[in-house]
Amino acid sequence: MNRNCDWQNPEITQIDREPARVTLFPYATEAQAKKAQRAFSPYYKSLNGSWDFYYSDEGVCPDGFEAVGFGVEDWDALDVPGNWQMSGYDIPQYTNVVYPIPLDPPFVPDDNPVGLYRRWFHLPSTWKDGRVYLNFDGVNGAFYVYVNGAKVGFSKVSHMPAEFEITNFVHEGENLVAVEVHKWSDATYLEDQDFWRLSGIFRDVYLLGVPQTHIRDLRADATLDESYEDGLLTVCADVTSPEGAKLAFTLYDGEKAVHTGCADAEATVKYEVRVPAVKKWTAETPNRYALAVNVLSGGEVIEAARVMIGFKKVEIRDRQLFVNGVSIKLKGVNRHDTHSQLGHVTPMESLLRDVQLMKRMNVNCVRTSHYPNDPRWLDLCDEYGLYVVDETDLECHGAQMGKWMTGDEGMVFDFSGSPEWKKAYVDRAERMVCRDRNHPSIIMWSLGNESFYGENHAAMYARIRELDPSRPIHYEGDRENHQSSDVVSVMYPAVEVVIREGESDDPRPYFMCEYAHAMGLGPGSLEEYWQAIYKYPRLIGGCVWEWVDHGMEVLTEDGETYYAYGGDFGDTPNDGNFCVDALNYPDRTPHTSVGAQKGA
């Protein structure tokens, strides 16, 4: 294998990928945008469904597989979104800390499995004069994209979207998209989370066909004035080919328009609104407003966008966490995107089940362990009312295995302090913020999980501060420098330690990003923890580990089903049943322990 390839170089984070932006779907009219049903937009085309699929354990790609005339008669059909292991290609592997491949960064084994995808799509004639973008919301593995036989681009980072402009690669009528997914890459070393190792295109794939003049990004900063009474909205819209166009802004409270205005289109349009006596967003009162932005050319609407926003202000002062001037406590959980039958694919009914259960259990906060969750999950948190600690797709826990196995205090490899990996770290943080910044539910950003601490975290912190100064930043690994975390963040402290910290004069709030491990008969001591949390203002709460068991539903020869865990598929190395350690069973049936969580 060529060890100088794109997927074994951490300084190559992408090739010809579009800059990160918010999740935004275009519509032809404001009435369409109001319904918020993207499937009915003439500017949207889903590529979910059956794709032609080829898998190679050795990473062998048939020559010319991306070509229009290549024969796929001996290929299989695979549903997208999906993880190929869940359809019998390769096996699921569960490991918590130990890397699934030998630690030799940035290199990966020569026998690196590859999954090849092909699908035809029809480009409507109405799209021929506009711009066309191809979007992948999540691909586990480093991947190349081809359209009609030509290479379009390349991307990494499993839980972040990748968008490519394909205007110059497509034509009216039938077109071919092909995707080449490499299971392991240098990115594997930064995605060592405690979960099943699964591969492939596991989130939505779709096309956007928009007018030449259109909104590329729409950032809405909705905060409060110093009295916490009036809303202050700053909108920044990036417009492609803005010449001669106008933007019309309308802010709705339900059906009532509370503000309307207009501005000439520019490359970036900044628009500010003050909303008297605004309805504020909190987890208990998730009031939202609809921001409608229409692009007008010649007085006619050519594109309509709509963003749901919430007015709130997050502050750290007096050693406490405040939302809208009120000190709050976070009764949280850690949540993975997981499904017992589909792996990392999360159907809407599963997401709804999660949010409804959380509200019933008096959960008010979710840490997206340990990567940005499906964007639809954040929509539900906005709507139902859950505070979110949004976490960068970053963990390199296995780099310290030498310390645990030999007693050596050093690490096998210091990713977080290595300049060669700085770009990859910052790329992950930047893309998270750029995707999720409009969600009112997000009250803190996280620099990742169990990745120790180094200058790369300081660079992440600085970049997030540039992009969004309105929210605090959390990182548990910054234990000594205190440069990259606005709260003291800890894991699994004893109750006595928590009480001692409550009495400390440290100026930062104290947050347990993981505590009360729920495995077996856990979680324990929740009543004692919460007696301390309520007593001491500095203690702002924590997130129980974890929300739902990761057991995989398996059918036996007798027709019975059971939940499999690490090692049940012959996967090595594995961490056994450590993936079934939550408040709920894999099918979301609550464990008996949820009573302790609800009543704490």
Residue locations for each model-derived region?
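Beta-strand-rich binding/interaction modules
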Residues: V145-V147, D230-A263, V269-Y271, L291
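Short strand-turn-strand beta-turns centered on an Asx-Gly dipeptide
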Residues: Y146-V152, Y252-G254, G298, N324
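Extracellular recognition modules
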Residues: A178-E180, A290-N294
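Surface beta-strand/loop "capping" patches
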Residues: Q212-P242, R588-A600
